[in-house]
């Protein structure tokens, strides 16, 4: 695994600004509201030709009666335990605080490289005020401005030099990316924590607790996965605050990054219009999909309950009729193992390649059994087929009239391919391409 670098500090000292600066894009949400970053946020970064995983954390506050603040503190402590190198960020404008002193004392006992950094140092006056931090007696003190990129490269050059040498690099092709999406408060974070076996994401009954997309690398059955827990996708009318708008965009980007999308549905509420919108995003992006119906244990059930729920999903999501459905309880752990079993099975289909000879045999049989409808009075002829890609499996079918193939016939061919080659759980893409008779 690549080495890990954790950025920790009090709320609103600029951790996410530094994180975004190093990542090179808006990955963590930045806002003046303290506590905006609540979970640990992971991203792969390369600096000075050295790849490493950067961790952004929620604010590290003194012990508080507020449960959410306590959880954020616990997340920061976990990040420090995971990390190979720690960047402790302080606020040059706010000055030295008792919280800073408390954390510094704790970090003195950590047996790993720690970089003490004063952020928001933008001018000579503030530089002088940052002198208060030298009273901590911590030796080397770095002053930077993450917002204006002052001193950041010098800091990171030293951080990279302190990284343990990694013998292996993260192979993107070897990792299955799983996005966990759904409306707020359907149990996404609880499901993630149950899958991982520990509290990786802050789970709280308040809707919208997870604001950023949170990435976690883990292994299951000797295979590697990247689990992306997204902020809940709300209705457009409810995303008036800029913070919520960023979260929705981040959720949609997470779907784009994923191979497999877990669409979480609240069993207590059934399928909603917003569930359909979320599933539509995943379908349009060409992702393998699995419906995960959570809180199944809370329903009063009879012999027909399961069948009715399956029928509702199949009816509302006709375009995702190929997607498997798993009924779970993230809270109790009921049938949680089925989720990763389905992910593994679906990913195998999503990555599958079919031999050209087998593909053309099935293609020819399908065309012979049911000819394509005429187009403008002309017969649509097909010549041969080839698979040109995976994730999703993509096929090019050569024909004399690529624009004349009716969508219903495309669906017919897709169903034949799915049936013949067991593409359960995976979308398929068909491209009709013209071919001159002389070719």
Curated annotation (Swiss-Prot):
GO biological process: ribosome biogenesis
Gene Ontology terms for molecular function: GTP binding; ribosome binding
Gene3D superfamilies: 3.30.300.20, P-loop containing nucleotide triphosphate hydrolases (3.40.50.300)
Keyword Repeat: yes
One protein family per Pfam: KH_dom-like
Chain ranges of the EngA-type G domain: 3-167, 176-351
Record carries keyword GTP-binding: yes
Residues that coordinate or bind GTP 1: 9-16, 56-60, 119-122
Residue ranges annotated for the KH-like domain, each copy included: 352-436
Keyword terms of this UniProt record: GTP-binding, Nucleotide-binding, Repeat, Ribosome biogenesis
Chain positions recorded as GTP 2 binding sites: 182-189, 229-233, 294-297
NCBIfam families found in the cross-reference section: GTPase_EngA (TIGR03594), small_GTP (TIGR00231)
Family according to the record: Belongs to the TRAFAC class TrmE-Era-EngA-EngB-Septin-like GTPase superfamily. EngA (Der) GTPase family.
Oligomeric form and interacting partners: Associates with the 50S ribosomal subunit.
Function summary: GTPase that plays an essential role in the late steps of ribosome biogenesis.
Name assigned to this protein: GTPase Der
């Amino acid at each position: 695994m690549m080495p890990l670098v954790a950025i920790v500090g009090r709320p609103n000292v600029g951790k996410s600004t530094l994180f975004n600066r190093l990542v090179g894009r808006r990955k963590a949400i930045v806002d003046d509201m303290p506590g905006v970053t609540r979970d640990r946020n992971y991203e792969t970064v390369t600096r000075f030709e050295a790849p490493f995983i950067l961790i952004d954390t929620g604010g590290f506050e003194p012990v508080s009666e507020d449960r959410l603040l306590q959880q954020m503190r616990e997340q920061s402590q976990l990040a420090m335990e995971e990390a190979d190198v720690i960047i402790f960020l302080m606020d040059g404008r706010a000055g030295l605080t008792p919280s800073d002193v408390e954390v510094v004392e704790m970090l003195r006992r950590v047996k790993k490289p720690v970089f003490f950094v004063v952020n928001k140092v933008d001018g000579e006056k503030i530089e002088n005020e940052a002198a208060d931090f030298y009273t901590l007696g911590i030796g080397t003190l770095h002053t930077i401005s993450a917002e204006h990129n002052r001193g950041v490269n010098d800091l990171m050059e030293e951080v990279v030099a302190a990284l343990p040498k990694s013998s292996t690099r993260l192979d993107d092709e070897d990792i299955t990316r799983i996005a966990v999406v759904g409306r707020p408060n359907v149990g996404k974070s609880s499901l993630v924590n149950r899958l991982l076996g520990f509290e990786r994401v802050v789970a709280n009954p308040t809707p919208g607790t997870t604001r950023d997309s949170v990435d976690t690398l883990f292994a299951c059955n000797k295979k590697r996965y990247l689990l992306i827990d997204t902020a809940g996708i709300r209705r457009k009318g409810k995303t008036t605050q800029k913070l919520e708008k960023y979260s929705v965009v981040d959720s949609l980007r997470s779907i784009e990054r994923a191979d497999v999308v877990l669409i979480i549905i609240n069993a207590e509420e059934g399928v909603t219009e917003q569930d359909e919108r979320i599933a539509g995003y995943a379908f349009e992006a060409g992702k393998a999909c699995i419906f995960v119906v959570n809180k199944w244990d809370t329903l009063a059930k009879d012999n027909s309950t399961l069948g009715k729920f399956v029928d509702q999903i199949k009816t509302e999501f006709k375009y995702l009729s190929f997607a498997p459905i798993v009924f779970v309880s993230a809270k109790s752990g009921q049938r949680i193992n089925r989720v990763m079993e389905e992910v593994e099975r679906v990913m195998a289909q999503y990555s599958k390649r079919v031999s050209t000879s087998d593909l053309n045999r099935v293609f020819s049989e399908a065309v012979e059994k049911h000819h394509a409808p005429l187009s403008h009075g002309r017969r649509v002829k097909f010549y041969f087929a080839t698979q040109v890609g995976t994730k999703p499996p993509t096929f090019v079918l050569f024909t004399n009239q690529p624009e004349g193939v009716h969508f219903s016939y495309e669906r017919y061919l897709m169903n034949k391919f799915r049936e013949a080659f067991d593409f359960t759980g995976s979308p398929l893409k068909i491209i009709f391409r013209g071919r001159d008779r002389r070719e």
